[in-house]
Amino acid sequence: MSGEDNYTDYDTIIAEIESRENATKQYQHVIRMIYLITYSVVLILGVTLNFIVIIISCLKNKKSPTVSSWITALALTHLVSSAFIVYQLLYAYNNFDWNYGNASCKLSSYITYGSMFSTAAMLSLWSISSAILKIDCLNLCKNCNIILISLSWAIAAILACPSLYSREVRYSQCIDDYDTDELKTTQEGIARLKAVVIMRFLIGLLAPALVMFLSCLTSAHRNCKVCKEQAQIICAIKIAFFVFWGPQIFLTMLQATVTNSLDPILLKYGLPVATALATAHSLISPVIYFLFGFSFKMKWMEHDSDKCETVLDRGRPLLHQ
């Protein structure tokens, strides 16, 4: 009887192990398919649509240099980010086996977070310039927008640097590792990780949200129909930034700071979905331009709202273009 019981226990253990392995394989397959579909769509549509936006905005630069400059800069940022998705696509396709070197592992993460920070900085500085800087001030500095855009890229280049330090290939996987000791997790490594994710939340999300909200309160009210349409589109791309990046940054911060009190299912399924959502941000802006503008020609860019504000300030009729 004892021998039969041992065989029964052994069979039960084997069945449990096989069940866990099947569940793990099924989970990995689902996550892999989510990434493959998302990355493929972002790579194809992100590169194509952002390239189209760059061409259109450059053609409309003479009619509306202010808006076209910011739209071009955003599209260029998202174009680069979309192009580098090819590494993540190949990574998911090869069952998360990284065979492309340590440098590309670091650069891929650096470009991703650089895109986030540059977008946040551009939308923030654009909001400030629209709320504070008037047309007369802009005339004194014709390259004011170019300077602000360059400043946005410089800020992003600095804030994304932790990826160059932490990202590395370990056991054929491209992961974040903030520990100097390769064999174990240290308190110093955990502290560095917490500092980075909190910094991304505060500077990448919270500060831009506050700046955009305050700028919205202080910006001039426009009665012009075209101005309103343009403002709605710009507002939509600002909201989209927080909707697409917010979950990933917030969940990553929670994972690093309060892991023990979180539901494991939330991180197991929520974080991969949030990561895919953040990746999709690179293509959402062109979609907003075309859908909200009801035209692939992006005619809403032809209107210069700064000139409209200047006419209003002088008490003249609204200027329609």
Residue ranges with predicted function:
Residues 243-253, 270-321:
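Seventh transmembrane helix
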Residues 177-205, 209-211, 217-252:
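Intracellular effector-coupling site of seven-transmembrane GPCRs
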Residues 42-43, 73-85, 113, 148-160, ...:
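Alpha-helical transmembrane segments of multi-pass membrane proteins
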Residues 114-150:
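Class A GPCR helix-loop hinge within the 7TM core
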Residues 1-52, 178-182, 187-189, 196-197, ...:
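Extracellular N-terminal segment of 7TM GPCRs
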Residues 21-23, 95-114, 141-148, 158-206, ...:
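Loop architecture of class A 7-transmembrane GPCRs
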Residues 28-40, 66-126:
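Extracellular TM2-ECL1-early TM3 structural module of rhodopsin-like
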Residues 1-23, 138, 145, 294-321:
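Intrinsically disordered regulatory tails of 7TM GPCRs
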